[in-house]
Swiss-Prot record:
Name of this protein: Dihydroorotate dehydrogenase (quinone)
UniProt xrefs under PANTHER family: DIHYDROOROTATE DEHYDROGENASE (QUINONE), MITOCHONDRIAL, DIHYDROOROTATE DEHYDROGENASE (QUINONE), MITOCHONDRIAL-RELATED
Residues the record lists as binding substrate: 69, 114-118, 175, 180, 249-250
Protein's pathway: Pyrimidine metabolism; UMP biosynthesis via de novo pathway; orotate from (S)-dihydroorotate (quinone route): step 1/1
Signal peptide positions (record): none
Record Pfam families: DHO_dh
Gene symbol of the encoding locus: pyrD
Subunit-level organization: Monomer.
Length: 344
C-alpha cells in the first residue's frame, strides 16, 4: 500500500529543503516503529537467508549507514523489509557537523550531494538508542572520528567507539572514507591503514574475550581509488584478517553531473552517478581478496537489476541509501525479490 503512495509522499518531501525533509522522514519512521504502522504498510519482502561474515542475514538487501545517524529509527526501518540495518556514523562526542545548507538533491541525475560532516549525538546517546530498539535482526554499527580529533589520533576515536558499541552490534563498520571530515581519507593510505587495522583487530580480540563473542569488523572505503590503492587496501584487509569491506562511499567526482543545479556544491555525491565506479571497485577488490573478505556493495542501486549487478561484480550483500530516498520501500522489495529469484 505504502509503495503506491510513496510517489505522492516523495513529491511533498522534495518540495522541502533536503535536510528538513530528512528530519521529517526520521520522525515519521520513529513514530511508525513505535506503532507498528511501517510494517503494516510496507510491501512484503521474501526471506532469502545469506550467511556472510559468520552472520545470518534475512535477505541480502540492507540499509546503508547515514540515513539514521543516531540509531533512533531502527524499528521503523526494519519493518520496511531490509535484511539488515546499518546505523551511524557515530563519533565519541556529539558534534553538529558542517554548517547548513549541507544536503542537495540532483533529481535529474537521481543523485544527492551531502557534506553533513558526521553530525550526531555522540556514542553514549547512540548506544542508548540502540539498546531501546526492539529489533533483533542483523545490525551494523558504523563508527568514525570527531572532526576536531587530529588525524594522528584518529585511532583513539575508533577504538573508543568500538569498545562502546561492541556489545550491541552484529558487526561494526569502520568508516574511513567520508569526504566530509578533513583528512579522513588519508587513513586509506597504506601505512595509516595498516596501523589502524592492527589496533582495531587487537582491540576486537580483547573485547571478544571480555564479552564472549567475536563481532566482525568491516571497512568502508571510497570509490575514488586507483588500481594501486585498491590493491594496497585489499592486501591490508587480508593481512589483518578483516571480516568484511563495504564498497563504496560517496564520490568527489562530478563528471556525471556537470552543469546540473548544485553540481558544484562541495561534498560527496551519491546515487546513480556512483554506480559504475562502485562496481569497478568491487570487481577489483574481488580479484584481489577472492572469497576471503566478503564485500557489501553499495552505490547507485535503483532496481533489482542494479542489485544483481553488484553481486555479479563480486559483492555478497548490497545496501541502499539514495535509491531508497528516490524510490521508497518498493525498492527494498524489488531488490530482495530479484536476488531471491537469482539464488533459487
Amino acid at each position: 500500500m505504502f509503495s503506491s503512495l510513496y510517489p505522492l509522499v516523495r513529491a511533498q518531501l522534495f518540495r522541502m529543503d533536503a535536510e528538513d525533509a530528512h528530519h521529517l522522514t526520521l520522525r515519521l519512521l520513529r513514530a511508525a516503529g513505535r506503532t507498528g504502522l511501517a510494517g503494516a504498510l510496507a510491501p512484503r519482502v521474501p526471506d532469502s537467508p545469506r550467511t556472510v561474515m559468520g552472520l545470518t542475514f534475512r535477505n541480502p538487501v540492507g540499509l546503508a549507514a547515514g540515513l539514521d545517524k543516531d540509531g533512533a529509527c531502527i524499528d521503523g526501518l526494519a519493518a520496511l523489509g531490509f535484511g539488515f540495518i546499518e546505523v551511524g556514523t557515530v563519533t565519541p562526542r556529539a558534534q553538529p557537523g558542517n554548517p547548513r545548507p549541507r544536503m542537495f538533491r540532483l533529481p535529474q541525475a537521481d543523485a544527492v550531494i551531502n557534506r553533513m560532516g558526521f553530525n550526531n549525538a555522540g556514542v553514549d546517546q547512540f548506544v542508548k538508542n540502540v539498546q531501546a530498539a526492539r529489533y533483533r535482526g542483523t545490525l551494523g554499527l558504523n563508527i568514525g572520528k570527531n572532526a576536531d580529533t587530529p588525524i594522528e589520533r584518529a585511532a583513539d576515536d575508533y577504538l573508543y567507539c568500538l569498545e562502546r558499541v561492541y556489545p550491541f552490534a552484529s558487526y561494526v563498520t569502520v568508516n574511513i572514507s567520508s569526504p566530509n571530515t578533513k583528512n579522513l581519507r588519508q587513513l586509506q593510505g597504506a601505512g595509516e591503514l595498516d596501523a589502524l587495522l592492527a589496533a582495531l583487530k587487537d582491540k576486537q580480540q580483547r573485547l571478544a574475550d571480555l564479552h564472549g563473542k567475536l563481532v566482525p569488523l568491516a571497512l568502508k572505503i571510497a570509490p575514488d581509488l586507483d588500481d594501486e590503492q585498491v590493491k594496497s587496501i585489499a592486501d591490508t584487509l587480508l593481512r589483518h584478517q578483516f571480516e568484511g569491506v563495504i564498497a563504496t562511499n560517496t564520490t568527489l567526482s562530478r563528471t556525471a553531473v556537470q552543469g546540473l543545479p548544485h553540481a558544484d556544491e562541495a561534498g560527496g555525491l551519491s546515487g546513480r552517478p556512483v554506480f559504475d565506479a562502485s562496481n569497478e571497485v568491487i570487481r577489483k577488490l574481488r580479484a584481489e581478496v577472492g572469497g576471503d573478505v566478503p564485500i557489501i556493495g553499495v552505490g547507485g542501486i535503483f532496481s533489482g537489476a542494479d542489485a544483481q549487478a553488484k553481486l555479479d561484480a563480486g559483492a555478497s550483500l548490497v545496501q541502499l541509501y539514495t535509491g531508497f530516498i528516490y524510490r521508497g520501500p518498493a525498492l527494498v522489495a524489488e531488490c530482495a525479490q530479484a536476488l531471491a529469484m537469482r539464488a533459487a
